[in-house]
Amino acid sequence: KQKLGDKANQHIIATTDQNKGNLIKIAKQEGFPTFYIPDGVGGRFSEFCPVGLLPAAVLGIDIKLMLQGAKDMDQMCRTDDISKNPALFASLLMHVAMETGHNISVMMPYADSLRLISDWYCQLWAESLGKSVDYDGKLVYAGQTPVKALGVTDQHSQVQLYTEGPFDKVIILLAVNNFRATVDIPHGFADIPDVNFLCGSTMNKLINTEMEATEYALTKAGRLNMRITLDSVDEYSLGQLLYFFMLHTAYSGAMLNINTYNQPGVEEGKKATYAMFGKQGYEAKKQELDSAPKKDQKYII
């Protein structure tokens, strides 16, 4: 406003709930163009509504191709035939894994361009499945802890734990057949066998070979793992991948008989924060916090 004055609202677009929340009040007051979030869609499931599509479009991403990928994955996953429904098949396998004590899920893409998928997956999987009670009101303490890794970087750190540590993990390898660029490995040091054997190959082949080698090592050690392969990292494939994981999460929550779409544990922390700041309407929560047992000084260093 300091620079643009009354024209400032022409440079801001709001994405918000249509009826409630502070942002819709501000958007109406300031006259911001507004896109609305559909009712009942949580942030972690919002990639295919304006929350995800608007910033993607602004960045020049072809959102029509993303939606086509999601649509095709949806069609593929409508069958009751488990062998032909990838999201349902993956959910069944993961459910069996959880039932047998594999309570950690590692997301390990072998492409830098997919590394942020792991961050989103961690929120999606943890916030959706980490629930203390099921639909019957029974205490179940459900969930599987998501961990992010990056190939090949974390082969030299985390994979040691995955191959020789506790049998409590499922490792998901994200592979790419065709990278956006080909990086040649030049010839040189022909007299050094430990270097020369790579000459004339490509970094593309090296990355995928290391992924296959890691997959082999995990399997040889009896560690549960699965591989998901994208033909390339493009809008269509990402649309398929994002939709797959959202549906995979929904199926998994149904198998656990829990509410996949709420986050009461997160809300409790928000309420406590509001109370600590003295927000109106949270006086009872403030009293609860004030009456809670204090930290014992002898345990504070």
What are these regions (language model features)?
Residues P109, S113, P146, T202, ...:
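Conserved aromatic-histidine-acidic binding/catalytic patches
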Residues V147-D234:
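Helicase-primase coupling helices
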Residues D39, A87-A90, M94, M98, ...:
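N-proximal short alpha-helices
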Residues T214-F277:
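C-terminal helical cap and adjacent loop that interface with cofactors, partners, or active-site loops
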